[in-house]
Amino acid sequence: MDSTTNSDSPILDPNPEDVEKLLDESEEESEDQSTERLLPSELFILPLNKRPFFPGMAAPILIESGPYYEVLKVLAKSSQKYIGLVLTKKENADILKVSFNQLHKTGVAARILRIMPIEGGSAQVLLSIEERIRIIEPIKDKYLKARVSYHADNKELTEELKAYSISIVSVIKDLLKLNPLFKEELQIFLGHSDFTEPGKLADFSVALTTATREELQEVLETTNMHDRIDKALILLKKELDLSRLQSSINQKIEATITKSQKEFFLKEQLKTIKKELGLEKEDRAIDIEKFSERLRKRHVPDYAMEVIQDEIEKLQTLETSSAEYTVCRNYLDWLTIIPWGIQSKEYHDLKKAEIVLNKDHYGLDEIKQRILELISVGKLSKGLKGSIICLVGPPGVGKTSIGRSIAKVLHRKFFRFSVGGMRDEAEIKGHRRTYIGAMPGKMVQALKQSQAMNPVIMIDEVDKIGASYHGDPASALLEVLDPEQNKDFLDHYLDVRVDLSNVLFILTANVLDTIPDPLLDRMEILRLSGYILEEKLQIAKKYLVPKARKEIGLTASEVNFQPEALKYMINNYAREAGVRTLNGNIKKVLRKVALKIVQNQEKPKSKKITFKISSKNLQTYLGKPIFSSDRFYESTPVGVATGLAWTSLGGATLYIESVQVSSLKTDMHLTGQAGEVMKESSQIAWTYLHSALHRYAPGYTFFPKSQVHIHIPEGATPKDGPSAGITMVTSLLSLLLETPVVNNLGMTGEITLTGRVLGVGGIREKLIAARRSRLNILIFPEDNRRDYEELPAYLKTGLKIHFVSHYDDVLKVAFPKLK
């Protein structure tokens, strides 16, 4: 429908007197030309924007107040009730400003049947479309009046047109089945037409379609009956295909919706029927029954039972659809799922425990001894109270697996979580229930998962715990790990005291330096040192190779590691303190072997092959060795001394190099990423040697006019600690005397300004590093004699140890020829 929206148009003047004058002139001219003619030769033209109309149609259009409305009112009162309807060339053109150049030449003549005014000054105009017209020439642009010619269809019905008509009628019938809305338009058409006129049938069928305005205008302009009905049939079939597709889509959607609605209604009816018959309870009753059933299997303390009963009473008053109901139900779910009073039954069998520990781990005698002590205490005291053990050692030495083994030998449930990088105390103590998505902390979650009040809880990477504005998790752990407090542990979410005193806590860390002292004070520290070559070799043979072979699907008959291959792998590819890299290299070799076996099996005539991994062919699987030697010098030069260090990754050798260059004054310079403590050690060593030189080297002057440069190789690696004190003095003395230190000597110890040698830590790790670097003469502080004596015999084999309490003792070992 088209309408006029602007009554102030400069082109059309809405003056009714002018319109009547022009209308009179038009009637006179029309009567002069032909008194018998029913349709006028001159018509006012009304532009159409959307779609053209076709003869034989009844068309209602909406006209807003303005020039066209005035023209239509005058025409309706006159004897000439006809107006021309012509489509604009461009869609959505401003019809008040349209000229004849912007209109198509072909349109229709319409008779005004009725004008029905409506609110707002507009009107609904009912038109009867009579004939096709063609604009011959405009008469006056101001009112878009034109001289027109008419086209009457040839009513001769040929066989071909009859066939076309039958096809169109058939398609219309199919359309009526798919879209019942077409029935009303069909009845209007049949009121003043019939299907025996092909032209009218074509026009009607095209009007039913949703074709584009250009396609419809093309049919309107086609006067040849055969061409017109052919185009009409094409558009009608397109409409049929579109209607079928639309109907198919609607059926699918309706089927889905109907099915869902049907299922919903049936379920609701079934639920209602079951409730009426007492066969099914409502959601609230089901929840309460579930909570009550849990409580019957638990020994809930009175203070907790009181809270649970209050919450159940509150739940009974809430609507199941409310948010508060969900919060209350979740809270009760957590309160009732905690295993109140339930404990795992322990087995205190020392022999069986020892077998399990030896089966799972090689070495680690101190750790195994502590576990056996734990079991013995539990057996004598008729129950094992909670303990807090912290396993400290480099990565890959088996800290986490030891925790699993402890749970296994005690027959307790095991729960592990890592606090590395944790910055929110709510992870430990839970969130307040006022927060959306609130939940208890890890401790309560551990109890829920283990369903016992005495599980083994492993807290990994406790040395890497963080802190933020959300709180300090390390401080939250203080309550958890304090035996005097954790029996009344209070989780923020539960807000009910929970007894953690029967939980065995096992913590792991690489270093102790970053653990807060109050937290460290609550733990029993057990150190796991790195492994030496012999230990790694046994671990690889007994544990790593069989396990990796099983994982990859190989057997011992298909691949075999020779001992020298494993030794070569340990020395040249996996020198870390643990065995993680070694395990990765073993799997890498086995994967390559698996590939070769499968490739061989796919050959037409394949034979079974056994792969023997030796030190000679190991490089074909792992590539070039990563490490060459831990020793920088096979023969120690002047000014160099070998120290022993201890890091979070295990023990290591530390070389101290000293050289002197000419300078105006005597001075010392230290490089090699040394920390503050090590810088102080170098100053102490420098000062001590200066003060004691007259005793060690009478007649020598202390580096006259020289600058001494002390360097610690591997400058990219930060180093710190006091244990290199005697090594620095030895390096400086070697430089001053121009005498090399005895070969294969390693040392560690802190020195004071008076020459006293103090004890240091990490004796086992340093001993392992010395063995790895083939140092067989070692100097340890006298204060560390006890630490050395506690080490297993296989670590001491082949080593000559000197214990010293003063640097005078170091001098005798490092420079045996010096008197």
From Swiss-Prot:
Any matching Pfam family: AAA
Residues that bind ATP: 393-400
Active site (UniProt): 723, 766
Gene3D superfamilies to which the protein is assigned, alphabetical: 1.10.8.60, 1.20.5.5270, 1.20.58.1480, 3.30.230.10, LON domain-like, P-loop containing nucleotide triphosphate hydrolases
EC class (word): hydrolase
Keyword ATP-binding: yes
GO CC annotations on file: cytoplasm
Biological-process GO terms, alphabetical: cellular response to heat; protein quality control for misfolded or incompletely synthesized proteins
Assigned EC number: 3.4.21.53
Location relative to the cell: Cytoplasm
Keywords in alphabetical order: ATP-binding, Cytoplasm, Hydrolase, Nucleotide-binding, Protease, Serine protease, Stress response
GO MF, one annotated term: ATP-dependent peptidase activity
Classification via InterPro entries: AAA+_ATPase, ATPase_AAA_core, Lon_bac, Lon_bac/euk-typ, Lon_lid, Lon_proteolytic, Lon_Prtase, Lon_prtase_N
Record field: catalytic activity: Hydrolysis of proteins in presence of ATP
NCBIfam families reported in the protein's UniProt record: lon
Similarity annotation: Belongs to the peptidase S16 family.
Reported function: ATP-dependent serine protease that mediates the selective degradation of mutant and abnormal proteins as well as certain short-lived regulatory proteins. Required for cellular homeostasis and for survival from DNA damage and developmental changes induced by stress. Degrades polypeptides processively to yield small peptide fragments that are 5 to 10 amino acids long. Binds to DNA in a double-stranded, site-specific manner.
Stated name of the protein: Lon protease
